Amino acid sequence: MRKLYSSMFAIVVCAFLATSCQKDYKSDGAAQPSKSNAAAKTNATTPADVAATLTKLRATLPPNFESRLNNIKADLLAKVNPEYKYTVLNVLKLAATPCDDNTMVTQWLNMQLSDWTYDIIFYASLTGMLDFPTYDALLFTNSESGQQFGINGEYTQRITKTIKDLKRFWDIQSSQIIVVPMHGSMLQDRDRVIRMDMVLFGDTEPAAEFWADLIAELLQDIPQYRNGNHPIFTFNSFAQASFSFPPYGVVPDKIVMGDGIMDSYTAIGYGDVAPQAILAHEFGHHVQFQNNVFGTESSPEATRRTELMADAMSAYFLSSARGASMQWKRVKEFLQVFFNIGDCSFNSINHHGTPTQRMAAADFGYQTANNAQKQGHILSSVEFIALFDAALPTIVSK
């Protein structure tokens, strides 16, 4: 995971400095580092006032800025499931993937990025804006009290109801699991940005203050960043088991829901089902955590198993009479879009399964609910896992 982030950033820096470092990063499967394809993903031109601001800011960068992202704490990178990272890399043209970039979601994201020039992408990556909302939610948003989901709180009611239903549905200890939002607006909070910079990059406080002030100036002067609320900053959701994080304390069991990932599916017409389905998938990972499903193996096959199982668990809950009780036709329409966001890096340890395999796993979950002899009966998590593992060879053969 560290290699992915470091390579991504190095490509942008190489292009920014107009140097030739193609040989170093081509083997990572990343885009070749040139302004035409590493970051300048559109034909957008930078307005004169914005260009002047960026030129002024470039002169203030510290001498060692090229190596900045190499300092990210590897142990923190491992905490976040990069479920949607390849989609972000793909639309920003920061790394080449074999994924289909002509899906409804990537088309929408590309529209949101149509006015992002190479320099705008560069500063979003260099400063940490692409990462700070994610890790701030992971490490420091540790209470559900007063939280709202969505930029304007538009998903709060659905998320709150769905997590209550999930906790009643699955037979795990879940009272300690919290659901928290990921907001790009945290980039406006200087103190939070300073803290996040010191934690993620290991910077001294004066250095962190420099980057926080740079971000503040960028948010003020570059309208493309939407004051931190651009969906690219929060296009993610993930589950995390509790862990100790000294000197700050213990991070609780949690699910993080990004504004950007929910906004994207709402924009293309699936706002009625997307928040619930995404949350149900992430809750499935907590069911797995408590049943020791993950084990110690790190391989594409092991990750594919757990992700396909979470897909099946989500569909089982969504279609069950005692779960979300949604119409399967509507859920299936959403999942066919959701599973095509672009996870096709088959040799990556983060591989989630092909779209066809993921749909087969979801169909297994639906059929398990629909074919139950006693409608409304909920399988125990142990029973469901056993049934899924028995069906897995058939699912992956799709």
Regions found by a protein language model. Give the residues of each.
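A metal-dependent hydrolase signature that marks the N-terminal structural subdomain at the beginning
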Residues: 32, 40-230
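Short pre-active-site segment immediately N-terminal to the catalytic Zn-binding motif
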Residues: 261-277, 297-301
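Bacterial Sec-dependent N-terminal signal peptides
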Residues: 1-5, 15-48
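Extracytoplasmic/secreted envelope proteins and their assembly/folding machinery
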Residues: 160-167, 254, 280, 284, ...
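Catalytic Zn2+-binding segment of zinc metalloproteases
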Residues: 282-298, 317-322
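Long, well-structured alpha-helical subdomains associated
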Residues: 25-28, 319-398
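Extracellular/periplasmic catalytic domains that process cell-envelope and extracellular macromolecules
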Residues: 247-251
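Post-HExxH zinc-binding segment in Zn-dependent metallohydrolases
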Residues: 300-327
